Amino acid sequence: MKVVKFGGSSMADANQYRKVRDILLADTQRRVVVVSAAGKRFGADHKITDLLYLCHAHTQYGVDCSNIFEMIRSRYLEIRDQLGVELDLETEFAALKSGLDRKMVSQDELASRGEYFSAKLMAAYLGFAFVDAADWVRFKYDGTVDQTATYELLKQLDKGIGMFIPGFYGRMPDGKIRTFSRGGSDITGALAAAALNADVYENWTDVSGILMADPRIVDNPATIPEVTYDELRELSYSGAQVLHEGTIFPVREKNIPLNIRNTNDPTDPGTLIKESFATDSDPNRFITGITGKKDFSIISLTKRGLSGEVGCLRRVLSIFERHNISIDYVPNGIDNLSIVVSTEAIAQSLYTIMADIQKELQPDSLTVHDQIAVVAAVGRKMAFRPGISGKIFATLGEAGVNIRMINQGPDELNIIFGVDNKDFKTAIRVLYDSFVK
């Protein structure tokens, strides 16, 4: 059995609904389907979820949102009518608007209605059952998912027939609707796959899998055919926008493969994500992907005898902890130590942190460098290929890119280096050309 999730681009209009129908009918194993709210139909269009949040904000400030609400309502009615589906949506929309006008609908509840109406409409279109996410996704009071209750409830609701589930939300212990953060329909699908011990979790979107580099930087980057969960974690952490970060844990825990596919090109196999692979689809490729993010700061301290000073690293890290600052990387040498953090995250407390470091560690020098970009080359096979690091540094040197920081984990799953913001795109392009083309 397969659990299948379709994103907003796959729910954008009646034509996309028909594509989803064809994909589901092509494989009877695809019987548990999670859907997002309708996404953009074209560049200047609006995502339904954005309109729902906007509508709620208007209401809270006493501004009439009737025009926005009508945009949402007419979008779903248009899809319904174009598909020829007999489903009374008017009554539900009227009740929702009435509750909204009386300020009886919370922001989370209103934001969740895009997924709700998508699932209702698709279920009626294909003759599947509709299973409300509020009937099985359970949150704890701290906002985390109660996996035990969630899994048990879905098992009870599963009758072995086709069903559509709205993504993105669940219910709190007090009965109120709560949403995940944006993109959370990915998590709903992962929870469903884990609860029902699916053979695979298919995530359908508008791209054919995970790309080896950002297409806004590299022209027509290749698709990654296979990637491990560890590699995906590294790619996502280092900047690749792949899946919602909470998606991986439920399926990985149950050792369920995750397949990212393209609704607009359903024959493309996309990217398969697993714990490990016995064989390799491309044994000559040693880098899985190249990604990165801009706007970091490097705080560096130097002190003679630092390596022999017990508790030095702990004291530095505790300073950042006191200021609730998440640290991204900690490259170090014998007598020097650097802390790499997001410039935005540290902006309000930089000088206080610098003063605390100066007071508690009394370094010989203490400097901060901003306008830094972090680039990561990720690949599970790099550890078995001598010379990868040398090739990376030589490639960047030939392109005139100065390396400001280097960091590599003991498992050699990635090589991370800092460059100036201005060299960010150049670094990714030349590395892609060197290792992939």
Explain the meaning of each model-derived region.
Residues 128, 198, 256, 325, ...:
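Short glycine/serine/threonine/alanine-rich loop segments
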